[in-house]
């Protein structure tokens, strides 16, 4: 099974093994992923399944989205996401839950990291600060030189400087599923996953574990 699911980060807690070892885990709620569209190689050039989760008021759904959901006979969700398929078969209207995973399985979790706003180079790139004394004046946290002189006469692309930090797509690979609660549609994943509590995350079987 290579397909993933859309979940919601609930927060972190810990569970204990039979030996009394404490394992920090992130609780991910896997809301029912409703299949809204099935794409195949003949019509779309690739095989994939499109899903939606949650609910959205009719006043917040555009006419195009309303028609798309109505065609699939699926309640409007808060968005649509797509997962590539290999050998799986799904029908429009099917639901995908946490049952597709099992304890001990390795997964990749993708989410949007917490936004930190405008950050300096010390916080953003782990630069060291300059001297506190020895003639240094009002330059304790500045990065210093950002380039050369007339040659090349410009700042190279990719130069680490101050700027917006966080709020970007981040994937943490090969996290172990400690427990699967099929009744409450919960996944307990070992370690931390990107994003704030309540944010959407995408859980897929680990790429590095397929081989």
Swiss-Prot record:
Q: Does the keyword Lyase apply?
A: no
Does the keyword field hold Ribosomal protein?
Answer: yes
Q: Which UniProt keywords apply?
A: Methylation, Ribonucleoprotein, Ribosomal protein, RNA-binding, rRNA-binding
**InterPro entries, per this entry?**
Ribosomal_uL3, Ribosomal_uL3_bac/org-type, Ribosomal_uL3_CS, Transl_B-barrel_sf
* The organism's place on the tree of life at top rank: Bacteria
| Regions that span the bilayer | none
Cite the GO molecular-function annotations of the record: rRNA binding; structural constituent of ribosome
Q: How is it modified after translation?
A: Methylated by PrmB.
Q: Which residues carry this modification: N5-methylglutamine?
A: 150
- Which terms under GO biological process does the entry name? translation
Q: Name one GO cellular component term.
A: cytosolic large ribosomal subunit
Any matching Pfam family: Ribosomal_L3
**HAMAP family given for it?**
Ribosomal_uL3_B (MF_01325_B)
Family per UniProt? Belongs to the universal ribosomal protein uL3 family.
Reported function: One of the primary rRNA binding proteins, it binds directly near the 3'-end of the 23S rRNA, where it nucleates assembly of the 50S subunit.
Assembly behavior = Part of the 50S ribosomal subunit. Forms a cluster with proteins L14 and L19.
Instruction: Please report the name of this protein according to its UniProt entry.
Output: Large ribosomal subunit protein uL3
Which source organism?
Stutzerimonas stutzeri (strain A1501) (Pseudomonas stutzeri)
């Amino acid at each position: 099974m290579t397909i993933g699911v859309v979940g919601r980060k609930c927060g972190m807690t810990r569970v204990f093994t039979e030996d009394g070892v404490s394992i920090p885990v992130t609780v991910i709620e896997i809301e029912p992923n409703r299949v809204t569209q099935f794409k195949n190689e003949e019509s779309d050039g690739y095989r994939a399944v499109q899903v939606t989760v949650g609910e959205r008021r009719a006043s917040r759904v555009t006419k195009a989205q309303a028609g798309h959901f109505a065609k699939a006979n699926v309640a409007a969700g808060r968005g649509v996401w797509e997962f590539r398929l290999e050998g799986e078969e799904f029908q429009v209207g099917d639901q995908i839950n946490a049952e597709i995973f099992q304890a001990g399985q390795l997964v990749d979790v993708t989410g949007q990291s917490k936004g930190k706003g405008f950050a300096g180079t010390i916080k953003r790139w782990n630069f060291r600060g300059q001297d506190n004394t020895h003639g240094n004046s009002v330059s304790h946290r500045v990065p210093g030189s950002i380039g050369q002189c007339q040659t090349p006469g410009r700042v190279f692309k990719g130069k680490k400087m101050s700027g917006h930090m966080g709020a970007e797509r981040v994937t943490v690979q090969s996290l172990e599923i400690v427990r699967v609660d099929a009744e409450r549609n919960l996944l307990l994943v070992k370690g931390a996953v990107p994003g704030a509590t309540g944010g959407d995350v995408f859980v897929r079987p680990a790429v590095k574990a397929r081989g």
